[in-house]
Amino acid sequence: MDVEIYQEDGVESGETAALDPTVFDIEPNDHIIWLDVKRIQAHQRQGTSKTKERGEVRGSGRKLYRQKGTGNARVGDAQSPIRRGGGRAHGARPRDYAHDLNQKEKRLARRSALSYKAANDNIQVIENFSLDRPDTRGLTDLFELLGVEGQDILLATAEVEREVYLSSQNLPDVNVQEVQSINTVDILDADVVLLQEGALDWLTDVLSTDEAVPA
């Protein structure tokens, strides 16, 4: 599968880039995608929810009234979970929600997400570019020339491009990240995945192999 390579000014360069079928044209594995999305979202949870249980609520521990002779149901102290102001029974406790997948599963999830995008012609390739200073107007003009304005855009850069990143901060529908940082959720959330040539090379090199390299 070949796609046009665009220049920094949004004009076709006349060259094409090949999308490796082992990365961009596989049978997507929906279950692995779900597992990876669940993993990513679990890592984003703070897990700091906390409620006071019976032994932590402030107050006296004395028995409210004698056991027998009042005609009322027997009770203990005021911290009982069944009383107003008492402790919470089985309340929330701080916990770690994180869980992990192995490297092959993470790569398969990203390949599956990229294959969905490629199947719908939602992957574009642009030459590597940098900015001397933040330029939001220039970035929006580029997206208009590429015909992707108004869509949720994931721009994967070959390297850390601080000025390009800063240029996107006032654009709520644009996500600029170095290619090594993008994950399955980033890909799925985007309507269009815009890859710099170097980013495409990195994805092809890393996701097309099962060797132990950073992913």
UniProtKB/Swiss-Prot annotation:
Any one of the GO CC terms: ribonucleoprotein complex
Any single Pfam family the record assigns to this protein: Ribosomal_L4
Top-rank lineage group of the source organism: Bacteria
GO molecular function: rRNA binding; structural constituent of ribosome
Composition skew (Basic and acidic residues), residue ranges: 50-59
Keyword terms: Ribonucleoprotein, Ribosomal protein, RNA-binding, rRNA-binding
GO process annotations (BP): translation
Keyword RNA-binding (UniProt): yes
Signal peptide: none
Renumbered residue ranges of the record's region Disordered: 43-101
Entry keyword annotation includes rRNA-binding: yes
Subunit architecture: Part of the 50S ribosomal subunit.
Family classification: Belongs to the universal ribosomal protein uL4 family.
Primary role: One of the primary rRNA binding proteins, this protein initially binds near the 5'-end of the 23S rRNA. It is important during the early stages of 50S assembly. It makes multiple contacts with different domains of the 23S rRNA in the assembled 50S subunit and ribosome. Forms part of the polypeptide exit tunnel.
Listed name of the protein: Large ribosomal subunit protein uL4
